[in-house]
């Protein structure tokens, strides 16, 4: 069993960003659309998981776009937000599906 721990940096942009992890479970016919849409704003981590830094305005835009793609009666999207990523540590157990060399 292998473990990977990625220290995550935090940009000091004037419009302070938050760190976002999005996890989704949508019906098969919408998986590709959701994945393609989220790749525009976040980093793909593994099947149905994206992460990255977004401002509040960017997150609102992503959520608005997602609401036009998903069926809220059948699909699920979970959004985790952290105000300060410096207190977060990412650990990967097992296969690392997207070994990023630069994590935002």
Feature locations, PLM:
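Intrinsically disordered, low-complexity proline-rich regions
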Residues: 1, 6-8, 13
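Extended, hydrophobic alpha-helical segments
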Residues: 6, 15-58
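Short, intrinsically disordered low-complexity segments
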Residues: 12-15, 38, 49-76, 81-82, 89
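Short, surface-exposed loop and linker segments with low hydrophobicity and enrichment for Pro/Ser/Thr
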Residues: 12-20, 68-75
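Short acidic, gly/pro-rich beta-turn/loop elements at beta-sheet edges
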Residues: 32, 62, 89
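C-terminal structural segments of small proteins and small subunits
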Residues: 68-104
